[in-house]
Amino acid sequence: MKSISIYTITRNQNIEQLQKLERQLSGRDYFLKMREWELESMKALTAELETCMEDVYALRFFYSFQIPRLGKEFDLLQIKEDQIVNIELKSGVVSDEAICRQLLQNRYYLSVLGRTIHSYTYISSQNRLVRLTKHDLSLIHISEPTRPY
């Protein structure tokens, strides 16, 4: 499986064409059933990133990455030599406790790779990006200049 440009994948409006494009770009052996709300959240996140980044088109993530046998899914995952960026997408209101629990669980699974992990959740209905620090959540303003991705 290959990482894909989230900018590219959010330009296509037709879900069937998008599934074909995602399969071609990622190299999956099957068509991924894309959820409409997740696509809309990804579009909203990409639009926000465009306001503060010139090269959003270059951001590459593994979309809907699953750990075999565990069935654990990561919405957006970027793996580099020295760090991992995990972004979970939400469309509706989710409690901070639920977000924290999910991000801590994700961090646990990803920690075996031995890299610095940056964990985020983007809630599109609130246009809210939160980051997991050590064990707490902090609100991030997307326009902040320090971005790990």
Which positions does each model-derived feature cover?
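Acidic-basic catalytic patches of nuclease active cores, encompassing PD-(D/E)XK
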Residues: M1-Y63
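Acidic-residue sensor for enzyme active/binding pockets
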Residues: E73, E88, E144
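Active-site metal-binding core of divalent-cation-utilizing nuclease and nuclease-like domains
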Residues: M53-E81
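Nucleic-acid nuclease catalytic cores
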Residues: V85, K90-S138
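Extended hydrophobic/Leu-rich segments
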Residues: Q66, S138-H141
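Single conserved hydrophobic/aromatic residue that forms the stacking wall/gate
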Residues: I140-Y149
